[in-house]
Amino acid sequence: EQVERRCKAYTADAHRTHLVQPGMVYISQTTEVGTLYTKAEVKALHDVCKKYGLLLFLDGARLGYAVESPGNDLKLEDLPHLCDVFTIGGTKQGALFGEAAVIVDEELKREFPYHIKQRGALLAKGWLLGIQYETLFTDNLYFRLARHAADLAVKMHKGFKEAGFYFLHNHETNQQLPIFTQTQFDKLKEKGFYFDHFADMKDGRIVTRFCTSWATDPANVDRLLEAIKDL
């Protein structure tokens, strides 16, 4: 609805030639606050984009974590039917570096190699990207690593709720955003835990961020959940 309102406002503006011409809608899965787009929501965005001649780009830096999260209904195999371009994250999901760009739109496919070259993104040893993904997609490793993070996120979410904490968003993806008082925040820092001061609330409380990943040690999650019990 937001995208359609923007598009309608743009096309109705008699002075639109003085504005930036819209060309693409960008979303990420998961989002920067750990929320998920549903399949129906992405389908709705796709339909609006087609209606107004826009491309739909999905940033999948955390795509594996999204796919393996409880309640997610947007699968990897759905994306070529709903997006013009999407990425399959590597850097945040076990690869040494790099992202895999999946281009569905045929016109973009023809132009993309030239954009890579012109913007300094062409690696002399590009096979180093390919071999990482070949390994990650062997024996379902990519999704097994993501499932590890998802399982620990569920455990963390449950532990925070049982300790009486509220969340900025109530979800179970690998980014958890529990809300702390300043005193709770300071006490947990003193216990030696590192976590993000994500945002400040109007009432003085602090939104924090804890992330799980393919490399998270379950023992560290246990230590954290034990530590928050007496905050």
Language model feature labels by segment:
Residues E1-K8, K39, K43, E134, ...:
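Amphipathic, non-transmembrane alpha-helical secondary structure
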Residues Q21-M24, S28-T31, L36, D73-T173:
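Active-site C-terminal subdomain of aminotransferase-like
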Residues T31, R62-G64, K92, T216:
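Active-site-proximal loop/turn and secondary-structure-junction residues that shape catalytic pockets
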Residues A40-D47, K51, R62-V85:
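Active-site pre-lysine segment of PLP-dependent enzymes
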Residues E41-L45, K75, L79-L82, L152, ...:
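A general structural detector for well-ordered alpha-helical segments in enzyme core domains, enriched
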